[in-house]
Design a protein with these regions (language model features):
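Hydrophobic "anchor" residues on beta-strands that sit immediately upstream
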Residues: 41
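Canonical P-loop GTPase G-domain recognition
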Residues: 38, 47-117
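Conserved catalytic network of the ASCE P-loop NTPase/AAA+ motor domain
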Residues: 2-6, 32-37
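A generic secondary-structure signal
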Residues: 29-33, 77-78
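C-terminal-of-GTPase-core extension/linker across diverse P-loop GTPases
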Residues: 83-85, 89-165
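Conserved G1/Walker A P-loop phosphate-binding module
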Residues: 174-182
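Conserved Switch II/interswitch segment of TRAFAC-class P-loop GTPases
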Residues: 3-26, 47-51
């Protein structure tokens, strides 16, 4: 019953797995139950364990060239098995590899009313300037839409509408400027 109300479904799959039959069946079940297909975000975890696992670069905390090729193959396969509006992303959470990219993708995938609240709970080391700017922009857009909806409920003379539009822009600018204090 709650599926249609979910802002985003983050589906974690192991990058070092080969069999996704149970995930495919569950994905199809959720779609049949009313989950919005555009709300799925697929993430490959354990990127550091993908073949050849012994080549993971512990110093740089990143995959080797051969592992990058393996991840590209797995990513393409998962994207085919689980169509999504968003790209499939690989991460190695224990070492923090690709987590800022995941956060950025997640923030872009969320509806505008959820971005700031979610972003405020992200650890500093996983934040990116791009994700922060997107959260601030969607916050301003949401305020603008709310303001416009409130003004549209009433009949105002043209001169007052002009003043309200000016006030709207200033209010939005002020709140976006204060965004990091609010969230």
């Amino acid at each position: 019953q709650l599926l249609p109300e979910l802002d985003l479904i983050i589906w974690i799959l192991r990058a070092d797995e080969r069999a996704y039959a149970a995930d495919i069946a569950m994905h199809q079940f959720l779609l049949n139950e009313g989950a919005d297909p555009s709300r799925f975000l697929f993430v490959l975890s354990h990127a550091d364990r993908v073949f050849p696992a012994e080549e993971w670069n512990d110093t740089e905390k990143c995959p080797s060239r051969q592992q990058e090729l393996s991840l590209a193959t797995v990513t393409a396969r998962v994207a085919t098995l689980f169509p999504s509006s968003f790209p499939v992303l690989s991460v190695a959470a224990p070492v923090g590899w690709n987590l800022p990219a995941f956060v950025s993708l997640m923030i872009h995938a969320l509806p505008p009313q959820a971005t700031s609240a979610v972003y405020s709970h992200i650890r500093g080391e996983n934040r990116s300037e791009q994700a922060q700017k997107h959260a601030q922009q969607t916050f301003g857009d949401a305020i603008g839409k709310s303001f416009d909806a409130a003004v549209a409920r009433f009949s105002f003379p043209a001169w007052m509408l002009h003043l309200l539009r000016k006030a709207r822009d200033r209010i939005i600018h002020l709140l976006v400027t204060l965004w990091d204090r609010l969230f």
